[in-house]
Amino acid sequence: MKLLYTDINHDMTEILVNQAAHAAEAGWRIFYIAPNSLSFEKERAVLENLPQEASFAITITRFAQLARYFTLNQPNQKESLNDIGLAMIFYRALASFEDGQLKVFGRLKQDASFISQLVDLYKELQTANLSILDLKYLHSPEKFEDLLAIFLVVSDLLREGEYDNQSKIAFFTEQVRSGQLDVDLKNTILIVDGFTRFSAEEEALIKSLSSRCQEIIIGAYASQKAYKANFTNGNIYSAGVDFLRYLATTFQTKPEFILSKWESKSGFEMISKNIEGKHDFTNSSHILDDTAKDCITIWECINQKDEVEHVARAIRQKLYQGYRYKDILVLLGDVDSYKLQLSKIFEQYDIPYYFGKAETMAAHPLVHFMDSLSRIKRYRFRAEDVLNLFKTGIYGEISQDDLDYFEAYISYADIKGPKKFFTDFVVGAKKFDLGRLNTIRQSLLAPLESFVKTKKQDGIKTLNQFMFFLTQVGLSDNLSRLVGQMSENEQEKHQEVWKTFTDILEQFQTIFGQEKLNLDEFLSLLNSGMMQAEYRMVPATVDVVTVKSYDLVEPHSNQFVYALGMTQSHFPKIAQNKSLISDIERQLINDANDTDGHFDIMTRENLKKNHFAALSLFNAAKQALVLTIPQLLNESEDQMSPYLIELRDIGVPFNHKGRQSLKEEADNIGNYKALLSRVVDLYRSAIDKEMTKEEQTFWSVAVRYLRRQLTSKGIEIPIITDSLDTVTVSSDVMTRRFPEDDPLKLSSSALTTFYNNQYKYFLQYVLGLEEQDSIHPDMRHHGTYLHRVFEILMKNQGIESFEEKLNSAINKTNQEDVFKSLYSEDAESRYSLEILEDIARATATILRQDSQMTVESEEERFELMIDNTIKINGIIDRIDRLSDGSLGVVDYKSSAQKFDIQKFYNGLSPQLVTYIDAISRDKEVEQKPPIFGAMYLHMQEPKQDLSKIKNLDDLVTKNHQALTYKGLFSEAEKEFLANGKYHLKDSLYSEAEIAILQAHNQLLYKKASETIKSGKFLINPYTEDAKTVDGDQFKSITGFEADRHMARARALYKLPAKEKRQGFLTLMQQEEENDDL
């Protein structure tokens, strides 16, 4: 055993490679061992340090791979399971327990997180050289009994399936101890690099190999000063010193201090000695010279976006200076927080990069496919799950138009549940092409229908049916077609996902092939495996910027290093124990165990680990290190790392980097896409300072260059303005939609729509767009139902009592096909019908026979011409006649309505006046009867707040007051309207005033007609207070935003409440006079 150490300013890898090269020349077989997280980088570093840059005698590997190398040809080798396979084994084990058998974990049997924790515990017991029986010292006996029961079942399953129940390292250690490998090992030298501690499993292997290998050489970083110190707690080198001292005691050897030929820049050495002095309590400090200040710099940025952009531009400058991408390393304090932002900005700056981290499959279409399939079976064909499966793009062959049409029908007919999906669609023949829909349904659902009928059977049979199902829906062909149009890098990602998917299927076949499973269990197993699976990518080329977590970095890793997100929250990283075994329980087990096995207690190693990670980070660069921190991290303020505060205190430069400055140097441009992005950002922003002459010159030249580039590619810089100008509809479209020889057809509702927002009229009446319909009744259907009840009721002139007539009307309406199908679909529809019947009975109290009023007609259609250019169509719900022969119009409403002269003036309430105009100009009646009014009847079941009712008589009175006609009435007919059924307060108008209202109403139609025929429709939803928009905005179509486009809204003309009535009448009269002129 040889132990070597050197300080952080020298290169331990170079030292160990020299040892390996000399041993290889002497004829020894060398195995160079590196940690799992550093194996790729370490292999490259070793090869670069070898004199010939290659050697057949030297193998760079890991402990686990070393075990496989020596035991590959050993007899009785069992099949190993990966994490997904182990998860399936634990799932199968937990499924075997009956309810109540597991006292602590019984409710977590199917929980994916719990199964993942069990897998982690299983692997940790192996690396700790412990067995499940060693957990008997847990605080809770019930917890130990549950874990023991679970692991015993798992052991039985592994033994039955002839799977390997020990790690490769443990098996290798047994083989070494047995002496079976002595011949192979006697000519072997083992070199270990990059470790500051060994797991119990690795330590046991080292002990076994130490007496059988020719030599074991272990290297670590530590200064002579630190190694000779009596007290090392808190020392920056404590991890390496404690590691060396433990090995020295265990193997009875003295560590040797050695120097490499390569030595870091003096500036890094000076900073490292200052940091060491702060942590070994000697307070030895060295004033930093300019060389040291050039080595390390701290940047403070505004947010993550600016932070990454500054680094991206710095990388582009290094390329401008002649360096390569491979000379640059980017480290992240929190990979998850920075990954998306860094990916977008690096692609914008054309910087190729490689993330040294396993990627999850959760966002892949194949995972969505499996998740949707599992949900379909579990939740019995919810519409959203079925549609999500079809939308993955890898299920079946269907055009986007057909899929949209199918989705529209599913929403309309509320298709859900297997019965509705697997039978022909029959509802909605008037609105949809059922033949086309059923063809689509058959092609999409036939394979699914057959697959979901799979019964409980052996896993291999279910898997075969699943594979046949995948063939039927063309999964592999669809996935190939989807991937074929992507970049080579993206194709490789999809290939890795597909490989992982097939591995999961193979694991399932191996583990559950002979196990009886139902389809739910089958899909749940595959889906959980897909959700938890990860894959790794190998960089397509060496010349890329490597990106990884800062705690995985080694000293002297690259020429230039940029460490982002070095805030207090992530630097240092505080390890937390999230396993099933607490730290206190781990310590109890370690204390009670007298074997070589022991649990690692990471929370107690935090200080040593973080100190060494910081020291490694500060020496990660060979030329320059930049540490960056954002003021805002994940939209919250964060503090500076204590390690960065130490650097600042010893004199390391601290720069406040603001937003991207407008510098004119050519090397500051970055690249074409980045420059384009900056120009667009500059155009959008409000420049808060005057540019210098040099900046103006730079940007004018840059923009001219960009414009030439964009013009050559047929691209324009997008211009975002506050304008919402619309294009005039072509004359061909207007002629087809509104023939010139025909009068323009309008209605009171169309007019209201026009004055609500002209663009709404365009969408609804020009383009003919409709809201999504449904077979379930909504407010429109409810109103039609009540209309029909009252129509039948008022036509019944029989001798029956009013209650009998009402019940008869309700029953007849309920039996009509249209309402019978609507209100018998499900419990919700039947409940709606009950409410409607109650409303009909409550509202009907106002319709009882009155000697002063008779119903003249119902559902009266009318056509009203204005200047032979406008034809107004409509249907009047009811026309009443008073005893004096005067007529009145009644319009049924399912919501509260009243005549508001202000809304009428602004075009938002023309209905009642239009109806008065229609019956007063009826050509079929020679002798025009007087008009007593036009009114709304709110169909409702009045509700009262009983806390405000003093006695029951008041309750009846208030109910009657709620059921009154509200609208506008003729003052001349006042005496016939004073029976309490009509709300007359502020609602009486003289004949002259009604004439003014009619004239203004016609003017509203004329103005609307002119605009409509012009084909120019504004986006102008109305606003009452110029602060909020009340009209329909259609944001997703128009892009209207109240805060940016309020000036485009149509402000209603308003008057004070006291002046409202007379003021608007005067305005109407003036407008009429001006119109006549």
Swiss-Prot record:
Biological process per Gene Ontology, one example term: double-strand break repair via homologous recombination
Family: Belongs to the helicase family. AddB/RexB type 2 subfamily.
EC code: 3.1.-.-
GO function terms (MF aspect): 5'-3' exonuclease activity; ATP binding; double-stranded DNA binding; helicase activity; hydrolase activity, acting on acid anhydrides
A family per Pfam: PDDEXK_1
The protein's name: ATP-dependent helicase/deoxyribonuclease subunit B
Task of the protein: The heterodimer acts as both an ATP-dependent DNA helicase and an ATP-dependent, dual-direction single-stranded exonuclease. Recognizes the chi site generating a DNA molecule suitable for the initiation of homologous recombination. This subunit has 5' -> 3' nuclease activity but not helicase activity.
Organism: Streptococcus agalactiae serotype III (strain NEM316)
Assembly: Heterodimer of AddA and RexB.
Miscellaneous comment text of the record: Despite having helicase-like domains, this subunit does not have helicase activity.
Alphabetized UniProt keyword annotations: ATP-binding, DNA damage, DNA repair, DNA-binding, Exonuclease, Helicase, Hydrolase, Nuclease, Nucleotide-binding
The protein's enzyme class: hydrolase
Highest taxon listed in the record's lineage: Bacteria
Cofactor(s) listed in the protein's UniProt record: Mg(2+)
